[in-house]
Amino acid sequence: DMLERIVTGEFGGSYVGSCLIAQSIKCAIVYDGYTSVSAVIKGMGYVGSTANRSQNAVNAVKYIFDDNNLAVRHRLFYMCTKDYYDSTPGNFHSTQNFILQYENVLFFDRW
């Protein structure tokens, strides 16, 4: 339930966006050894609300975690809005490997 709620909080309602967020969380668990969703939220600095969950987030979590699928065939670790990225020159995200933009969110891997 917490996983579905943070996916909703980090992206909103879009199914594709929810899949990208879910994959980012899964990559943190697989590659960084986080042992819980709460640890990922704290360790990766997620700030999205955890008050609610959308059906798209529920479906995305099932697709990425339960069915072991990917949103894209590349690791995803970090994300930020394009507005944040553009308004904060030299931010952490600008030092990472840009992978894709979906709607107003940029997704990154490490170098």
Regions inferred by a protein language model and the residue ranges of each:
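Bacterial extracytoplasmic/cell-wall-associated proteins, especially those involved in peptidoglycan
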Residues: 1-111
